[in-house]
């Protein structure tokens, strides 16, 4: 994280990075690098949220943790974004409790970029909502499309929903109900169902699924990658 922050401020002169954590440890790591010091500020946080801790209880109980302090900085307008390598559950819970959701957003998804033959695709959702509703999958599709177009620079990104076949009538109840809703969306480039084998081929720029399926896809990617490498 510290190296990433240093690389960021060295590459972009207009940004400022706040490193939130145990001050002595962070400064010791920073001392290894040369960087524009006016663009980096260390914010001391004395507590740590462990990976195994219940997220909501940890957010409420550890006010001086880096996750809680960082999220409050976003809420108070001191920062525009928050990045963490800590507990995913705590970041999600804290994001909703402290920062809040954007207007109209039902649930926040987890959306990593995954490698394909044609570049990166966005897998959304991969772990936040294992029992998602059709309306939420539609929102994920729209959010993913906006991200891929505006952040990744892909014009009119292709959106596909993960299914057990390419035919519209296939799938479980969730996919069957979501499919026509996605098809009716005029603001996304919905290409229909995609099978798991289509994902590494880059068939879709935005791969939509509920978190149970998405997490299986993500962990399979990780396992295959480590096996082959």
Language model regions located:
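N-terminal glycine-rich anion-binding loop in soluble enzyme alpha/beta folds
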Residues: 1-51
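A glycine- and small-aliphatic-rich helix-loop capping segment at beta-alpha/alpha-beta transitions
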Residues: 4-10, 90, 94-111, 177-182, ...
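Solvent-exposed alpha-helices and their adjacent loops that cap or buttress functional pockets
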Residues: 10-12, 34-35, 59-63, 73-77, ...
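Glycine-rich phosphate/diphosphate-binding loop of Rossmann-like nucleotide-binding domains
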Residues: 16-18, 23-27, 130-196, 205, ...
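Short beta-strand segments
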Residues: 19-21, 43, 84-86, 113-114, ...
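Phosphate/nucleotide-donor binding subsite
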Residues: 35-79
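Glycine-rich phosphate-binding loop
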Residues: 73-92, 170, 175-182, 187-229
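Short, acidic/small-residue loops that bind anionic groups at enzyme active sites
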Residues: 93-127, 184-194
């Amino acid at each position: 994280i510290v190296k990433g922050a240093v690389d960021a401020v060295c590459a972009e002169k207009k940004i400022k990075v706040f490193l939130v954590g145990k001050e002595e440890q962070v400064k010791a790591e920073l001392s290894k690098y040369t960087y524009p010091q006016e663009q980096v500020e260390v914010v001391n946080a004395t507590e740590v949220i462990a990976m195994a801790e219940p997220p909501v209880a940890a957010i409420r109980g550890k006010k001086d943790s880096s996750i809680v302090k960082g999220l409050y900085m976003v809420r108070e307008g001191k920062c525009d974004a928050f990045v963490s390598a800590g507990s995913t559950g705590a970041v999600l819970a804290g994001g909703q409790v402290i920062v809040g959701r954007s207007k109209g957003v039902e649930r926040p998804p987890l959306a990593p970029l995954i490698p394909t033959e044609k570049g990166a695709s966005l897998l959304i959702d991969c772990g936040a909502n294992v029992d998602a509703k059709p309306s939420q999958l539609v929102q994920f599709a729209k959010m993913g499309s906006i991200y891929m177009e505006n952040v990744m620079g892909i014009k009119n990104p292709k959106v596909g929903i993960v299914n057990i076949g390419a035919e519209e009538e296939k799938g479980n109840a969730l996919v069957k109900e979501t499919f026509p809703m996605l098809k009716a969306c005029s603001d996304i480039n919905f290409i229909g169902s995609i099978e798991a084998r289509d994902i590494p081929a880059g068939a879709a720029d935005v791969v939509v699924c509920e978190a149970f399926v998405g997490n299986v896809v993500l962990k399979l990617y990780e396992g295959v990658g480590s096996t082959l490498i």
